[in-house]
A protein has these predicted regions:
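A glycine/threonine-rich phosphate-anchoring loop and its flanking beta-alpha core
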Residues: 1-69, 163
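Active-site segments that bind and position negatively charged phosphate/pyrophosphate groups
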Residues: 59-177
């Protein structure tokens, strides 16, 4: 992860707290080797992929207007994740799939996709409360929260949700969306 953020869990107080100190935490460089991810379990891989998508969606579903470049960057990275995730899950030692997922994860977490956008991290805050109390992997908790969150988002910005469906998931474009 290339962000300036971290999360600390305090087990005896059932608290999970985020800290943001980019000047200290953001790495200056990283050596990324997809082969080092081959032994990750399917569960951890899927949870990481879910977290990547969540980080991008929390930037993508912005109330900020006129950010087509950011939107297209988000859509491109999400589309790559959608394409590569099944390959990573079915072929855990596929170097190219792992490399693409690794790069997508870096971009998802380093803020590149959200430049100029108002961001909404409420879903992450909700998940932190869940995983502070229960033994839940972060990405798995987000997988539970995001369908409801997306339903909520559709009520407030149906056009953006339709755009997401068409551009990321290849749902046929329709005036009925």
């Amino acid at each position: 992860e290339g962000s300036g953020n971290a999360v600390i869990t305090k087990l005896d107080g059932l608290r999970k707290l985020g800290i943001r100190t980019p000047e200290i935490l953001r790495p200056v460089f990283a050596v990324m080797n997809p082969e080092l991810t081959y032994t990750l379990s399917a569960w951890q891989t899927a949870s990481g992929i879910t977290d990547m998508m969540a980080h991008i969606m929390e930037r993508y579903f912005s109330n900020t207007q006129g950010v087509e470049i950011a939107d297209r960057m988000c859509e491109g990275v999400m589309k790559a994740i959608v394409n590569e995730a099944p390959r990573v899950m079915s072929e855990p030692d596929n170097y190219d799939a792992r490399a693409n997922i690794m790069w997508a994860g870096t971009v998802a977490h380093n803020g590149t996709c959200g430049v100029g956008c108002e961001e909404d991290w409420a879903s992450h805050g909700l998940e932190h409360e869940i995983s502070a109390i229960y033994d839940v992997t972060h990405g798995a908790g987000l997988a539970v929260i995001f369908p409801a969150w997306l339903t909520y988002a559709a009520k407030h910005n149906v056009g953006k949700v339709a755009q997401y469906a068409v551009r990321v998931w290849d749902v046929p474009d329709s005036d009925d969306l």
